[in-house]
Curated annotation (Swiss-Prot):
Protein name as catalogued: Protein RecA
Pfam families, sorted: RecA (PF00154), RecA_C (PF21096)
InterPro entries: AAA+_ATPase, DNA_recomb/repair_RecA, DNA_recomb/repair_RecA_CS, P-loop_NTPase, RecA-like_C, RecA-like_N, RecA_ATP-bd, RecA_C_sf
Cited function: Can catalyze the hydrolysis of ATP in the presence of single-stranded DNA, the ATP-dependent uptake of single-stranded DNA by duplex DNA, and the ATP-dependent hybridization of homologous single-stranded DNAs. It interacts with LexA causing its activation and leading to its autocatalytic cleavage.
Gene designation: recA
Lineage: Bacteria, Pseudomonadati, Pseudomonadota, Gammaproteobacteria, Thiotrichales
Length: 359
């Protein structure tokens, strides 16, 4: 029997025993397809992720220091999922979800599925059941640090429980991974940072829950606070920096910078001004910003106010930025080709280099 016939016989036997689709060539029509995504709700982050959003059927880890904007990122993703007609679930192990803030970010709180589990085992079992149902598009677990093993809860304060949480996460992720891929569900774990004791060289920071999540995650995002945004003498928000430290679906190590305004969420207008000026969609001369030869404001704050009031121009600028930076997802209406130097939208950055250093 030739090699080809032996292989076809083996493939046929595998399909017969385990079902159609259990094994296939990567070039087969059933296997070859673009990755489905859920937009992050932040243009700069969609670009940094390389595919226009979070990949479905994968595990994502978002980690960072306290009050750095981790939960905000997940709520924005939930809002985007719901806008597309999807169903979202939030496993609130920290018991700290603020419905008012979620609503402010665009989340349909009436249709958001929420669970506040008592133990880590219960939280992960609920997440697994939601994933296996196939009826949920995104599941957020907030947070890994709050997934307390049952043995620790039932034990006395001060008892030592070495490695319990790491074992729990390792076991759960082994079980979850195949179901997540099969149901094409996006699962986001929020994680916290801890300090490793006795580290003299290198980064002493690490995440909770052992190493399993680091391996199983297709994308890992590190969230950091930047400088303060001031309205006069009052602090009205923070600059946020998100670094893609691991990415299995696109080139990693890109960074997204944006503004988080207290009580409002992410400032879309600030993002459009920054990206528009960077790629010459918005002209900047001194302190003045202009769009298509028309001055829109002196200074960033005035320009933000203008875009808030003039939604048609804001949407036009947003579309131009998306067509330039994510041409595969948002094709140019005027041309099938990606914008080049000297075209209608001119860029200061060489397009060949752009995809490696966009943000």
């Amino acid at each position: 029997m030739s090699k080809e016939k032996a292989l076809e016989s083996a493939l046929s036997q595998i399909e017969k025993q385990f079902g159609k689709g259990a094994i296939m060539r990567l070039g087969d029509q059933e296997a070859a397809h673009d990755i489905d995504v859920i937009p992050s709700g932040i243009i700069a982050l969609d670009v940094a992720l390389g595919i226009g959003g979070y990949p479905k059927g994968r595990i994502i880890e978002i980690y960072g220091h306290e009050s750095s904007g981790k939960t905000t990122l997940t709520l924005l993703a939930i809002a985007q999922c719901q806008k597309q007609g999807g169903t979202a679930a939030f496993v609130d192990a920290e018991h700290a979800l603020d419905p008012k803030y979620a609503k402010l970010l665009g989340v349909d709180v009436d249709n958001l599925i929420v669970s506040q589990p008592d133990t880590g085992e219960q939280a992960l079992e609920i997440a697994d059941m939601l994933v296996r149902s196939g009826g949920v598009d995104i599941v957020v677990i907030d947070s890994v640090a709050a997934l307390t093993p049952k043995a620790e809860i039932e034990g006395d304060m001060g008892d030592s429980h070495m490695g319990l949480q790491a074992r729990l996460m390792s076991q759960a992720l082994r079980k979850l991974t195949a179901n997540i891929k099969r149901s094409n569900t996006l699962v986001i774990f929020i994680n916290q940072i801890r300090m490793k004791i006795g580290v003299m060289f290198g980064n002493p920071e690490t995440t909770t829950g052992g190493n399993a999540l680091k391996f199983y995650s297709s994308v890992r995002l590190e969230v950091k606070k930047g400088g303060s945004i001031k309205d006069g003498i009052d602090v009205s928000g923070n600059e946020i920096k998100v670094k893609v430290v691991k990415n299995k679906v696109a080139p990693p190590f890109k960074q997204a910078d944006f503004e988080l305004i207290y009580g409002e969420g992410i400032s879309l207008e600030a993002e459009l001004i920054d990206l528009g000026a960077k790629y010459n969609i918005i002209e900047k001369s001194g302190a003045w910003y202009s769009y298509k030869g028309k001055k829109i404001g002196q200074g960033k704050e005035k320009s933000k106010e203008y875009l808030k009031e003039n939604t048609a121009e804001r949407d036009e600028i947003e579309r131009a930025i998306l067509e330039l930076l994510l041409p595969n997802k948002y094709p140019n209406k005027d041309s099938n080709d990606s914008p080049k130097e000297g075209s209608k939208i001119k860029t200061k950055v060489n397009p060949a280099v752009t995809q490696d250093e966009l943000i």
